[in-house]
Amino acid sequence: TKEFFVHSMDLRTNHYYTPDGLARMVRKASGTRYYNRIAYSLQPLTDSTCNILFDVTENPLTFAKIGLHYNEFSGISAILNLTNRDFFIPNSRDLVTLNIGENFRFRAEHLQYLGRISNFAFTLGTQFDQFNITTYNNYKESGLYDQSYLKFDGKLGYSTNRNLTIGIGSRFEWIKYNPNIASSLEFEGKNNFLTSYFFIRQNTLDKPSYPKRGIKIDAEADWVYTQNADVVVHQTPTSLDSVFSEDPYGRVLFNFESYSPVGRRGTILANIQAGINFNYQNNIMNEFSIGGLTPLFHNEITFAGLREGTFYSPSVAEFRLGYRYQMFTNTYLTARANILFNNFISTSSFFINPDVLSGYALTFTYNFALGPLEVSAMYCDQSRRVIGYVNIGIPF
């Protein structure tokens, strides 16, 4: 509506605006994703003031998307998305996304803009994931289990501008492990807990895929309340009911991405990831999974050189540098090197992890209609193995 557009920019009559100020206001309105195109012109008046004329093209209120995705970890899947704006309440967005394939995933979300300039947003959402996850022992496949994950989430965010959001929220999480092929150490059972958190999100990337400049920050400080574990440990040669801690604990999650152009075709990449559970000794089912190049599921710390779930750790910090070169239009070659530190705050009572890991990856990418085709070769100094990694399309 006209009112929402004017309010989203905080545009007022009989005010003085500079060209830079108008540009920032237009970017704020674009950040709501309600508009496909916003252009403006100035019409001089006889009293030395101007009328501002806006030419605005709105996005459809309802639209559907269909995509295909393949990854060696998650398999092949079709991704279906339906998004509607202002369906239940004005100034809102509702979406439902399905991932149908070798692993089933579901997400639903309602976002409600609040305030005159829509700088507050209240979000209610739910998500369900089901994965078949390979376990590893000494860097080799040793088992397979089903992981089911369900969460209900509510949060309130405040945007100082469309690039920076801070807020608070709470979520309920339910996790179930069911071994299919038991390894030397497996959990079987379920756990659930409530988490309250404070978050900061910033995104100044010039484009969502293969940006050349900008930063992206996702930071979260959590407090995990009492857990409700109903779990049995299968540990060769016996199975036992271990004593699990249900004590509350704090945790921090952090992800930083930076892109800096070098010449006409080059880009320097930098990435810092951290996941830390404090006072996490006999607690379970909230460790951080180490491995993989593509972020796919909760509590994942990507690492060039290892497959998803090679290690699980309660305290992880990863540092990565890379260089991406655009060979031709939509064709890229990317080199990455990373180092990862474990066990520097909390140490798991159930998982054995090396204190330091280092690895490398070389990726060829062709960006086409279905999304990026990424073929990688990875190497880890500790495993001393070269492994391949393939990702096609944009993940769930």
PLM features: residue spans?
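Extended hydrophobic-aromatic, low-complexity segments
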Residues: K2-E3, N283, P314, F328-A335, ...
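Acidic/histidine-rich, surface-exposed loop or edge segments in extracytoplasmic proteins
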Residues: K2-R12
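Gram-negative/organellar outer-membrane beta-barrel architecture
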Residues: D10, H15-S209, I290-E300, G309-A317, ...
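Small/polar, glycine/serine/threonine/aspartate-rich low-complexity segments that form flexible
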Residues: T62-S74, Y280-N282, I345-V356
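C-terminal outer-membrane beta-barrel translocator/porin domains of Gram-negative envelope proteins
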Residues: F63, S196-R201, L205-F328
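Short glycine-rich beta-strand segments
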Residues: Q127-F131, R171-I175, E220-N228, G275-N279, ...
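A generic beta-sheet turn/junction motif
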Residues: G263, Y366-L370, D381-S383
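C-terminal hydrophobic structural anchor segments
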Residues: G322-S358
